Design a protein with these regions (language model features):
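Active-site-proximal beta-alpha core segment in soluble small-molecule metabolic enzymes
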Residues: 1-130, 139
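Anionic group-transfer/hydrolysis microenvironments
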Residues: 27, 48-50, 95, 134, ...
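Conserved active-site and cofactor/substrate-binding residues in soluble primary-metabolism enzymes
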Residues: 28, 70-73, 77, 104, ...
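Conserved protein kinase catalytic core
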Residues: 52-54, 141-142, 184, 214
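Short glycine/threonine-rich loop-to-helix capping motif typified by GTGT followed
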Residues: 102-109, 140-153, 184-196, 254-257
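Acidic, glycine-rich loop-and-beta core segments that form the ion-binding/anion-interacting portion
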Residues: 107-168, 172-176
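Charged (often Lys/Glu-rich) extended helix/loop segments that serve as interaction or gating elements
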Residues: 170-276
Length: 276
């Protein structure tokens, strides 16, 4: 699936050449896609319900302020126009929160999208081929933190499917997911060396990696666990672990307790396998 926003014409054309399922971000993209690359047989639209999503996180929790997706009325109108332009199979996509650590997020998202799907099919008569629940199921970056239970999450989605879609005669609709962070984030590591140690109002460990290699801490203030492979235990100190970019937010850790480190030590920054 090709999900994008503010998409250049040549990228829509390339997606069509690849045979990718295009996921339109905006109602206005219907006319744009028609001129840029033509309307494919299978197409999807991204939904934004507006309001505040109570199960959201600081990364994404306010759909009304998000630049992604279209309103319900826009999505319904888009489906009508796309059908008239030759589209035969349709999908619905939404991402309402990012990196949730809650077994409730996916089932609640599913419930909202399944109810939307029933209404959309009723008002447009389209053949709904799939619903893409996207991502949002995250990991706990704190080593001792609570984790998602994917079996419980899956059961919640299944219950919503049977109660809403199956009951409405839509039991053939496929469900897609995009659980990249959940599957991959724990299995990536950023390995870096301590190159400098500086003492002013704080103690700084300068390393040979930077926000160029891992942006989350600089962008979101996100926590990533750090291990000193040369000194995993022993006396500790409070440090900032920083890169060399000329930006004061180029920091992997702020006021973090780590074993006393020396120049040349190898640090491992954990859980970097996704959204780096």
């Amino acid at each position: 699936m090709f999900s994008s926003n503010n998409t250049p014409a040549e990228e829509f054309q390339f997606a069509r050449d690849l045979g990718a399922t295009i996921n339109l971000d905006a109602y206005e993209d219907v006319a744009f896609l028609k001129e840029a690359a033509g309307i494919p047989e299978v197409i999807s639209c991204r939904y934004n319900p507006g309001g505040v999503f109570e199960l959201g996180t600081s990364i994404m929790d306010n759909p009304e302020e998000a630049k992604f997706g279209m309103t319900k009325d826009q999505l319904i109108q888009a489906f009508k126009e796309l059908k008239e332009l030759g589209a035969e199979k349709f999908g619905i996509h939404a991402l309402l929160a990012s990196n949730t650590v809650s077994n409730d997020y996916y089932p609640e998202l599913a419930r909202q999208l399944f109810e939307l799907a029933v209404e959309v099919v009723d008002k447009t008569g389209v053949e709904l081929d799939f619903i893409n629940l996207s991502g949002g199921v995250g990991i706990n970056y704190q080593p001792e933190g609570e984790e998602n239970d994917i079996a419980v999450i899956g059961q919640g989605v299944r219950q919503a499917y049977e109660a809403i879609l199956t009951q409405a005669g839509l039991g053939q609709v496929k469900i897609y997911t995009e659980l990249g962070r959940f599957m991959l984030a724990p299995y990536g590591l950023l390995v870096t060396k301590v190159t400098h140690k500086k003492q002013t109002y704080r103690t700084y460990l300068g390393v040979d990696a930077s926000a160029v290699n891992l942006l989350r801490p600089a962008m979101y203030g996100s926590y990533h666990h750090i291990t000193n492979m040369d000194r995993p235990e022993g006396e500790t100190e409070i440090v900032d672990v920083v890169g060399s970019l000329c930006e004061n937010n180029d920091k992997f850790a702020i006021n973090r307790s780590l074993p006393v480190s020396q120049i040349g030590d190898t640090l491992v920054i954990h859980d970097t396998g996704a959204h780096g």
